[in-house]
Regions:
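Phosphodiester-processing cores and adjacent nucleic acid-binding clamps
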Residues: 2-143
Length: 143
C-alpha cells in the first residue's frame, strides 16, 4: 500500500491460509524537509518522496502503524507524509528500501546529483542502522 496499510490484514490472512509467511510493509511518503511544512515549489510533484518500510518483527509492525498514523495526523499535505526526524524515532524493527523512481535517492541520481544521493543514503543508513537500509535495483526500461 502507498501511505497506508489498508490491505495488511487481508493480505496477512490470505498468506497464512496458503502457508506463506507475510512480510507487512508500506511505501510511505517522506517530506523533503519537515512533515509540518505544508508548502512546496511545485505542489504535489515535490511534496514527498517514496520510501518502502518493511516490518522485521512485532516492534517494527507497531512502529510502522505509528509512522503511518503520524503521516495522516501530522504530515498530511496532498498525501500522508512522515519525515526523517519521526522515522528516526520509530525505526526499530523496520527495514527500509530506497524505493522506486519516485524515491529521494533515485530522483537525485536521475538529476546527476550523485554526491547528494550518497549523503541521503548515509542518512538513511544512520537512521535505520547498519542492516536496516537497502538500495533497490529496479529495471525501469530507461536508457
Amino acid at each position: 500500500d502507498h501511505g497506508n496499510m489498508f490491505g495488511a490484514i487481508k493480505f496477512y490472512k490470505i498468506a497464512q491460509q496458503y502457508g506463506i509467511k507475510p512480510i507487512i510493509g508500506c511505501e510511505v511518503y517522506v517530506a523533503p524537509e519537515s512533515r509540518h511544512q505544508k508548502s512546496s515549489a511545485q505542489g504535489m510533484a515535490d511534496a514527498s518522496y517514496h520510501l518502502i518500510l518493511l516490518a522485521a518483527n512485532m516492534e517494527g509492525y507497531k512502529n510502522l502503524i505509528k509512522l503511518v498514523s503520524i503521516g495522516y495526523l501530522e504530515g498530511f499535505y496532498y498525501r500522508p507524509r512522515i519525515d526523517k526526524e519521526v522515522l528516526a524515532q520509530y525505526a526499530h524493527g523496520l527495514i527500509a528500501l530506497s524505493s522506486c523512481l519516485k524515491g529521494e535517492i533515485p530522483i537525485l541520481l536521475a538529476h546527476g546529483q550523485e554526491r547528494r544521493a550518497h549523503e541521503v543514503a548515509a542518512t538513511f543508513k544512520d537512521i535505520m542502522g547498519e542492516k536496516g537500509f537497502y538500495l533497490d535495483e529496479i529495471f525501469n526500461n530507461y536508457n
